[in-house]
From Swiss-Prot:
It is an enzyme of class 5 (isomerase). The keyword Isomerase applies. This is Cobalt-precorrin-8 methylmutase. Keywords: Cobalamin biosynthesis, Isomerase. GO terms for biological process: cobalamin biosynthetic process. The active site is at H38 (proton donor/acceptor).
Amino acid sequence: MIPLEHPILLESFAHIDRSVGPHNLSSQEYAIARRVIHSTADFDFLHLLRFAPDLPQAEFDPDLPEHQAIARGIESLRHGQTIVVDVNMVKQGIQGLVQRTFNNPIQTAIDFATIADPGKTRTETGMDRCIAQFPEAIYVIGNAPTALLTLCQAIAAGKAKPALVIGVPVGFIGVLEAKKALSLLPCPQIRVEGNKGGSPVAAGIVNALLMLAWREG
């Protein structure tokens, strides 16, 4: 197995572990949170990440991750599922590790729209087109709340059934509304509560899932 983690990264993880100390996250949840903390130097994410929906107790399997979101993410990455991201910064943050692991195709929504449709942003327009072509992809939104709202509306209308939604846009306009819309959907999802988020957070979550999938593969 090719080495995927640089010694400096592992040293940073050890520093984070010492700073965090005891916590209530599962090992897989913590692996994701730690990667996000490493990407942002912000320990608040330990408490802001949400993984949903939980598996029903009747379906509990001790050999599966606790959360359907993590399980679906790992399974989908292993099977080469397309990853749709909202902006190029997210793509740049994940493509190196994607190429060294499962080589999933990466599509960027904003590249699907050189001109925005009337009344929409370019990212929103591009997201519409990605949904039509890749309704079951892994969707990763790190920047544009309008893109996340567009995706949520498509899911609610039955036009999209993503393998996983990573919804972590950042900012003050439309962000809380978009995250709330995602939280009300039954689809597998990883999101960040509040105004924090961003492309480094989105990329960190994907990279953590890639490492979990690679190690357990």
